[in-house]
């Protein structure tokens, strides 16, 4: 459940929220109102995280309302869509994300929501859709991001083991991250 991201990130940031960064690999902006699995990014901004140091990789254009897309833009959040990831590659997307999220040299938290992956890769993720990134790209992103000294925390979210396929591919992917 992606609602863990809020508490996990705050724990990583400690007293350094003003210089902190956030990188999400997620199909959704997570900018909903309230306290839910669709609101951790908004709640972190409300807590004081600078939205200009937030980078969202893998945003799916058809899984987000135009209101959330406009909100992300107006807040100054850097969005690298699935289409852009396909064009520039996951390595370049991660490099750009680290530069932006780490601009103030504060701690970075990474949120890996597996709904960023193609539905065929993560059948145990109810929000996954066709057209997402591959398991290899998600693993590559996790390795690239966590090799940076500013990345101090990472969460893996949205795996419902009771819904996985017979070969347990989602669970195995989560374990390999």
Locate each region found by the language model.
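Conserved alpha-helical scaffold segments that buttress catalytic/binding sites
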Residues: 1-177
